[in-house]
Amino acid sequence: MSPMLQIAAEEMENPLIPPIPELVIGLIAFVIVFGFLAKKLLPNINKVLEERREAIEGGIEKAEAAQTEAQSVLEQYKAQLAEARHEGREEAQEQGATLIAEMRAEGQRQREEIIAAGHAQIQADRKAAASALRQDVGKLATELAGKLVGESLEDHARQSRVIDRFLDELDDKATTAEATR
C-alpha cells in the first residue's frame, strides 16, 4: 500500500459509526421521548383498546342473546304452525264428516221421494187398471147376462148401478179378507 493511502485511512473515520457525543445525546433524547409517550400516550391507547375489547365482548353477548331469542321465537313459531296444522286437519275432518252426513241425508231424502213417487205411480196405475178392469168386467157381465137372458140389457144407468154395486161388494169382501190375514 502506498503511504498516502495509509495516512488517508487513518485520518478518515468510519462513516457507519457515529461519534460518541452524538450517540449519548440521541440515547438521552430517545429515553425522554419514550418516557413521555409511556406516561401520556400509552394510557390513552390502553383505554381505547379496553373500550374496544368491552364493545366486542358486549356485541358478542348481545349477539348470543339475540340468537337465543331468535331460537325461542323459532320454536314458538314451529309450535304455532304445528297447532294450526292440527286445527286445520281437525276442521277439515269435521267439515268432511258434516258434508258426508248432509249427503247421506240428501240421498235418504231423495230415496224416500223416489219410493213415494213410485208408490204413488203404482197406486195410480192400480186405480187406472181397476177402473179399466171394472169397465171390461161390466161389459162382459152385461153381454153374458144378455146372452143368458136372451135379450139385450139396454138401460145403461141401471146397468152401471148394478155393476158398481156388485164390484163394490167384491172390493169390500177382498178388503175384509186381507184385514183378517
From Swiss-Prot:
Say if the entry is tagged with keyword Nucleus: no
Task: Name the source's superkingdom.
Answer: Bacteria
Which cysteine-cysteine pairs are annotated as disulfide bonds in the entry? none
Q: What is this protein called?
A: ATP synthase subunit b
Q: Which HAMAP family match?
A: ATP_synth_b_bprime
Say what the protein does: F(1)F(0) ATP synthase produces ATP from ADP in the presence of a proton or sodium gradient. F-type ATPases consist of two structural domains, F(1) containing the extramembraneous catalytic core and F(0) containing the membrane proton channel, linked together by a central stalk and a peripheral stalk. During catalysis, ATP synthesis in the catalytic domain of F(1) is coupled via a rotary mechanism of the central stalk subunits to proton translocation.
| NCBIfam families given in the database record | ATP_synt_b, PRK05759.1-3
Q: Which GO terms describe its cellular component?
A: plasma membrane; proton-transporting ATP synthase complex
Q: Which organism is it from?
A: Streptomyces lividans
